[in-house]
From Swiss-Prot:
Liver. Its cofactor is heme. It comes from Homo sapiens (Human). The chain crosses the membrane at residues 1-21. SUPFAM superfamilies: Cytochrome P450 (SSF48264). It is found in: Endoplasmic reticulum membrane; Microsome membrane. Gene3D superfamilies: Cytochrome P450. This is 7-alpha-hydroxycholest-4-en-3-one 12-alpha-hydroxylase. Keywords: Endoplasmic reticulum, Heme, Iron, Lipid biosynthesis, Lipid metabolism, Membrane, Metal-binding, Microsome, Monooxygenase, Oxidoreductase, Phosphoprotein, Steroid biosynthesis, Transmembrane, Transmembrane helix. GO terms for biological process: bile acid biosynthetic process; positive regulation of intestinal cholesterol absorption; response to cholesterol; response to nutrient levels; steroid biosynthetic process; sterol metabolic process.
């Protein structure tokens, strides 16, 4: 009789040894950055990194300097922390860094979408055409109508100025931005009330997926959570299917243009459904959280909300409603709000923390701003974490942890774009949208959504925190590296609609 216990044990030892051997044997070569493999074979620093990426990278930078390589789950990541050296990485004139390969694996895992030739360029092309210029103007009009519908027609809010409503600020912002954004991009049927109910149900499922997302990316889910992720993926593929889209009117030109490209490439409808899921996530995953932080900072800083309201009055006039069902709003005003622009940019500096990743597909030499050169090894991943290296750099942004609503304003009220590090002008003084080939193609629409929502809230509503002395919530450390951070807990607030004439 075969003793399967010892046999399986020996087999596991062999497999583990095979997996760990490359990491155990790896040594730092001449000209390479400092190498820190950690104490656990293969895993390296993976657990500390996932527990709190920000604190881990701070420790590594203190230990090794501005460039270092760490082992994370069998993969080697080299972090560059000097923003004055970012330029050549983002331009990649040597063509030795690749973003697409990593991104394709990620979207296949998370959304089930298998990339086709030319779709990355297609997304950027469609976004340039429909999420900027005249295309953006048209979409802003649709978004204003959707916000009016979600915030006024459907909620049944009392127009009595004495009627206060209480809610949780994060959920409030996320729900409104998600539902209005979803309806604006994916269209309506003839039954708009039913559309809103479905959008609300979709939001609830979206939040379930959202909460699992960080650990899903790192494959750290429990068995039941894996089953839940599978259920949610199938649900989104069904609810966002192209067959359902055919029943709707007013699908955005942006989405329609991209789906047309996929059809012309012969992409099956089932894969188009998964593409829609990816686009929903890309368009709605950060605007709600960003709006939450922006409104919370305004409520915690009376001088800031006063300045935004004064600016809004200058460019919009007195706030009013049209037929009590829609906001009267001059969309052109979005281009003339430098104070609000500074508030949003400061919010993103404080709370947007993406990671920029590039696969090194050939040995790559980086010349730092100091003149020192480092060799990056083929197969490693080059990583930038601008939140730590740029946003929180006191040389670039004095008192970096403090919210200053006018940080991005010149004394004359114009936008400030001149920032310096060690006396040298720095081009990348904030990087909330990524940069280079991985820059967010929908950033202009996302900014418009956030600005439009904030302007409607501060001009048409009285707002106050239930507890004015409540401290800002900490960020959820699981979300470092995934765009706009989310709070560790929600904050209660009150609001009431201004009286109508």
């Amino acid at each position: 009789m075969v003793l399967w216990g010892p046999v399986l044990g020996a087999l596991l030892v062999v497999i583990a040894g095979y997996l760990c051997l490359p990491g155990m044997l790896r040594q730092r070569r001449p000209w390479e950055p400092p190498l820190d493999k950690g104490t656990v074979p293969w895993l390296g620093h993976a657990m500390a990194f996932r527990k709190n990426m920000f604190e881990f990278l701070k420790r590594m930078r203190t230990k090794h300097g501005d460039v270092f390589t760490v082992q994370l789950g069998g993969q080697y990541f080299t972090f560059v922390m000097d923003p004055l050296s970012f330029g050549s990485i983002l331009k990649d004139t040597q063509r030795k860094l690749d973003f697409g390969q990593y991104a394709k694996k990620l979207v296949l895992k998370v959304f089930g979408y298998r990339s086709v030739q030319g779709d990355h360029e297609m997304i950027h092309s469609a976004s340039t055409k429909h999420l900027r210029g005249d295309g953006l103007k048209d979409l802003n009009e649709t978004m204003l109508d959707s916000l009016s519908f979600v915030m006024l027609t459907s909620k049944g809010w009392s127009l009595d100025a004495s009627c206060w409503h209480e809610d949780s600020l994060f959920r409030f912002c996320y729900y409104i931005l998600f539902t209005a954004g979803y309806l604006s991009l994916f269209g309506y049927t003839k039954d708009k009330e039913q559309d809103l109910l479905q959008a609300g149900e979709l939001f609830m499922e979206f939040r379930k997926f959202d909460l699992l997302f960080p650990r899903f990316v790192y494959s750290l889910l429990w068995p039941r959570e894996w089953l839940e992720v599978g259920r949610l993926q199938r649900l989104f593929h069904k609810m966002l299917s192209v067959s359902h889209s055919q029943e709707k009117e007013g699908i955005s030109n942006w989405l329609g243009n991209m789906l047309q490209f996929l059809r012309e490439q012969g992409v099956p409808s089932a894969m188009q459904d998964k593409f829609n899921f990816m686009m929903l996530w890309a368009s709605q995953g950060n605007t709600g959280p960003t709006s939450f932080w922006a409104l919370l900072y305004l409520l915690k800083h009376p001088e800031a909300i006063r300045a935004v309201r004064e600016e809004a009055t200058q460019v919009l006039g007195e706030a009013r409603l049209e037929t009590k069902q829609s906001f009267a709003f001059k969309l052109g005003a979005l281009q003339h709000t430098p104070v609000l622009d500074s508030v949003v940019e400061e919010t993103l500096r404080l709370r947007a923390a993406p990671t920029l990743l590039r696969l090194v597909h050939e040995d790559y030499t980086l010349k730092m701003s100091s003149g020192q050169e480092y060799l990056f090894r083929h197969g490693d991943i080059l990583a930038l974490f601008p939140y730590l290296s740029v946003h929180m750099d006191p040389d670039i942004h004095p008192e970096p942890t403090v919210f200053k609503y006018d940080r991005f304003l010149n004394p004359n009220g114009s936008r400030k774009v001149d920032f310096f590090k060690t006396g040298k002008k720095i081009h990348h003084y904030t990087m909330p949208w990524g940069s280079g080939v991985s820059i967010c193609p929908g950033r202009f629409f996302a900014l418009s959504e956030v600005k439009l929502f904030i302007l409607l809230m501060v001009t048409h509503f009285d707002l106050e925190l239930v507890d004015p002395d409540t401290p800002l919530p900490h960020v959820d450390p699981q979300r470092w590296g995934f765009g706009t951070m989310q709070p560790s807990h929600d904050v209660r607030f009150r609001y009431r609609l201004h009286p109508t004439e």
